[in-house]
Amino acid sequence: MPELPEVETSRRGIEPHLVGATILHAHIRNGRLRWPVSDEIYRLSDTPVLSVQRRAKYLLLELPDGWIIIHLGMSGSLRILSEALPAEKHDHVDLVMSNGKILRYTDPRRFGAWLWTKELEGHNVLAHLGPEPLSDEFNGEYLQQKCAKKKTAIKPWLMDNKLVVGVGNIYASESLFAAGIHPDRLASSLSTEECDLLARVIKAVLLRSIEQGGTTLKDFLQSDGKPGYFAQELQVYGRKGEPCRVCGTPIVATKHAQRATFYCRHCQK
């Protein structure tokens, strides 16, 4: 599933081609996504795009009368086309722009979403989200306060959007490795120093992935059709049985809440 770096990479890739241009029309080939494509999107015509923003894993296209909320789901990606290339099987939505560009949404598993809202504040998919991990609000003090009485393992807690948004399976595993923290540790067992370190490495790992265009493991592509290159720098995720890049101990893979977790028994305590 695309996580924060992949969504931010998509935002940065599409923004220059959309902001200041006008949506001439939307071409919806298959509106049966996780939720049906909103009727207002079908009716878009001569609508300028004012900004392209991100909240958590949602892309937000600001229009004069409302917002398009896009979620990439498990396998979605957005590409900017310079010409109307023939659509393939999983190309479900096109926004045809006045500058000759086309924003094409591809989603093999159709778990993504294209929603419309007049107001962002209070929308049900955004209302209960925690802070952005790259914001000043997310720091060691905040993390310690939220972990102090939490009797659950730290890995699934990091992936809870009520704690912090956008830290999915890949980046939770990578951040815990970078901080030297075992994923099965109770959140409440983390010290002040560990919370401070973990908050800092989460920011560092996410920023590094954004610099590399995100992580492509299967479906994700950047807006120019290229893969993200952070996969080449993964320390533990997807490396079951391979030697730890730090100590040489084989990487272990376990399941937490039906999600794969990767870690090093020697480096993470």
Swiss-Prot record:
Binds 1 zinc ion per subunit. GO terms for biological process: base-excision repair. Its cofactor is Zn(2+). It catalyses: Hydrolysis of DNA containing ring-opened 7-methylguanine residues, releasing 2,6-diamino-4-hydroxy-5-(N-methyl)formamidopyrimidine; 2'-deoxyribonucleotide-(2'-deoxyribose 5'-phosphate)-2'-deoxyribonucleotide-DNA = a 3'-end 2'-deoxyribonucleotide-(2,3-dehydro-2,3-deoxyribose 5'-phosphate)-DNA + a 5'-end 5'-phospho-2'-deoxyribonucleoside-DNA + H(+). Keywords: DNA damage, DNA repair, DNA-binding, Glycosidase, Hydrolase, Lyase, Metal-binding, Multifunctional enzyme, Zinc, Zinc-finger. It holds the Pfam family zf-FPG_IleRS. The active site is at P2, E3, K57, R259. DNA binds at H90, R109, K150. PROSITE patterns: FPG_CAT (PS51068), ZF_FPG_1 (PS01242), ZF_FPG_2 (PS51066). A zinc finger (FPG-type) spans 235-269. Its EC number is 3.2.2.23, 4.2.99.18. GO terms for molecular function: 8-oxo-7,8-dihydroguanine DNA N-glycosylase activity; class I DNA-(apurinic or apyrimidinic site) endonuclease activity; damaged DNA binding; zinc ion binding. InterPro entries: DNA_glyclase/AP_lyase_DNA-bd, DNA_glyclase_Znf_dom_DNA_BS, Formamido-pyr_DNA_Glyclase, FPG_cat, MutM-like_N-ter, Ribosomal_uS13-like_H2TH, Znf_DNA_glyclase/AP_lyase, Znf_FPG/IleRS. Monomer. PANTHER family: FORMAMIDOPYRIMIDINE-DNA GLYCOSYLASE (PTHR22993:SF9). Belongs to the FPG family. Involved in base excision repair of DNA damaged by oxidation or by mutagenic agents. Acts as a DNA glycosylase that recognizes and removes damaged bases. Has a preference for oxidized purines, such as 7,8-dihydro-8-oxoguanine (8-oxoG). Has AP (apurinic/apyrimidinic) lyase activity and introduces nicks in the DNA strand. Cleaves the DNA backbone by beta-delta elimination to generate a single-strand break at the site of the removed base with both 3'- and 5'-phosphates. This is Formamidopyrimidine-DNA glycosylase. It comes from Salmonella schwarzengrund (strain CVM19633). The gene is mutM.
